[in-house]
């Protein structure tokens, strides 16, 4: 079920029920809510490259993203360098994208909303 009445970043991953694989139509609807994220049909994932002024800002962002992941119990793949960081979400247990990926992506976007 696509719940677009409530902003993605205000929703939570419900750990008491297994995440449901999204249809192509649902995926496309959610992608509209996080336009800076890239969809990979091959990897069945969404990812975004974040850029920062320096290493310290990059690490601070990673720590904040890790905190979100821990709170939601949904953990991304994070790759980083001096002033760049790529965050990738997919749901391994569902073998593709679920609402959890989009909730966490939207919450991660909130970390840099004023940039």
Regions found by a protein language model. Give the residues of each.
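Charge-rich alpha-helical segments
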Residues: 1-115
């Amino acid at each position: 079920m696509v719940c677009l009445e409530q902003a993605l970043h205000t929703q939570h991953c419900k750990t008491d029920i297994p995440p449901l694989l999204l249809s192509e139509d649902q995926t496309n609807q959610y992608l509209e809510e996080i336009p800076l994220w890239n969809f990979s049909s091959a990897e069945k994932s969404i990812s975004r490259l974040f850029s920062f002024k320096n290493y310290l800002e990059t690490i601070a962002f990673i720590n904040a993203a890790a905190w979100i992941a821990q709170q939601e119990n949904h953990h991304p793949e994070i790759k980083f360098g001096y002033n760049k960081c790529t965050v990738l979400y997919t749901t391994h247990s569902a073998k593709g994208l679920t609402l959890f990926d989009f909730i966490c992506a939207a919450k991660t976007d909130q970390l840099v909303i004023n940039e």
